[in-house]
């Protein structure tokens, strides 16, 4: 049986989840793995840099329009063969995005045959600063078997990461690791490494802040496609390899607010 990795990446809004998820997906696909990325954000932008800036229809939008959805309507092949899917979100002010994800993924499973089972790695790019009832549903439904938290070394992203760890632990979902997407703050790698250690997990990667990431995104590309020789591309390759090989899964502890403030001073 295929040793399939199905991961969710959580973190504070705006911390760089979609950028990290899409570049890791591309890096793993370049290494010969079958990869799918499933965007779960109402903005439906998780796969945009794998598709050269193209936005694709979301499952929930098509369902609302009454379309008889087929696999080719919602699964698109992006850079390096990454399969790209956008679940979409509810209409503004109506419904729960988390529960919408469940509807979308169940629909995807029903129309895609063995496509999901054939993947070596499936990445769920999950929105939100907290693990609410809706957003943990993919975990409870068994869609996901590993969780990663993305943060920087600043107080608010760490506060969100800490809350996410608390929420995951409450539902019995192990944490596989922490990823630091740098904002160039003082002692950042040290802070996030210490945070990871104190919650019982591990720092998977420190991704330095580089202008090339924004430059590539502005043009509609992933770093892996547009700047493959950059130091950031190499970091994404190492992170992808580390995720594929990672076997560590812990029920994460969470820190007190006082300890978080102490860490980030």
From Swiss-Prot:
It is an enzyme of class 6 (ligase). Its EC number is 6.3.3.7. It holds the Pfam family Fer4_NifH. Keywords: ATP-binding, Iron, Iron-sulfur, Ligase, Metal-binding, Methanogenesis, Nucleotide-binding. It comes from the Archaea. The keyword Ion transport does not apply. GO terms for biological process: methanogenesis. It catalyses: Ni-sirohydrochlorin a,c-diamide + 3 AH2 + ATP + H2O = 15,17(3)-seco-F430-17(3)-acid + 3 A + ADP + phosphate. Its cofactor is [4Fe-4S] cluster. GO terms for molecular function: ATP binding; iron-sulfur cluster binding; ligase activity; metal ion binding; oxidoreductase activity. Transmembrane segments: none annotated. Belongs to the NifH/BchL/ChlL family. Involved in the biosynthesis of the unique nickel-containing tetrapyrrole coenzyme F430, the prosthetic group of methyl-coenzyme M reductase (MCR), which plays a key role in methanogenesis and anaerobic methane oxidation. Catalyzes both the six-electron reduction of the tetrahydroporphyrin ring system and the gamma-lactamization of the c-acetamide side chain of Ni-sirohydrochlorin a,c-diamide to yield 15,17(3)-seco-F430-17(3)-acid (seco-F430), the last intermediate in the biosynthesis of the coenzyme F430. Homodimer. The Ni-sirohydrochlorin a,c-diamide reductive cyclase complex is composed of a NifH homolog component CfbC and a NifD homolog component CfbD. This is Ni-sirohydrochlorin a,c-diamide reductive cyclase complex, component CfbC. It comes from Methanosarcina barkeri (strain Fusaro / DSM 804).
């Amino acid at each position: 049986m295929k040793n399939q990795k199905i991961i969710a990446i959580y973190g504070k809004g705006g911390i760089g989840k979609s950028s990290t998820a899409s570049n890791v997906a591309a890096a793993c696909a370049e290494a010969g793995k079958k990869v799918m990325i499933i965007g779960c954000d109402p903005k439906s932008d998780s796969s945009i840099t794998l598709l050269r800036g193209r936005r694709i229809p979301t499952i929930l939008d098509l369902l609302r329009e009454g379309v008889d959805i087929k696999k080719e309507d919602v699964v698109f092949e992006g850079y390096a063969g990454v399969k790209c899917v956008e679940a979409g979100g509810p209409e503004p002010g109506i419904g729960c995005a988390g529960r919408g994800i469940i509807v979308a993924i169940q629909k995807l499973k029903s129309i895609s045959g063995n496509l999901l089972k054939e993947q070596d790695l499936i990445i769920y790019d999950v929105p939100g600063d907290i693990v609410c009832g809706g957003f943990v549903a993919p975990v409870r439904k068994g869609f996901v078997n590993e969780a990663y938290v993305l943060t920087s070394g600043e107080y608010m992203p760490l506060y969100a990461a800490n809350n996410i760890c608390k929420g995951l632990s409450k539902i019995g979902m192990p944490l596989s690791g922490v990823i630091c997407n740098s904002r160039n703050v003082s002692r950042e790698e040290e802070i996030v490494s210490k945070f990871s250690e104190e919650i019982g997990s591990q720092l998977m990667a420190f991704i330095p802040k580089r202008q090339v990431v924004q430059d590539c995104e502005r043009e509609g590309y992933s770093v892996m496609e547009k700047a493959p020789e950059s130091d950031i591309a190499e970091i994404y390759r190492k992170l992808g390899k580390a995720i594929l090989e990672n076997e560590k899964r812990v029920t994460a502890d969470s820190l007190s607010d006082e300890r978080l403030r102490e860490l980030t001073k």
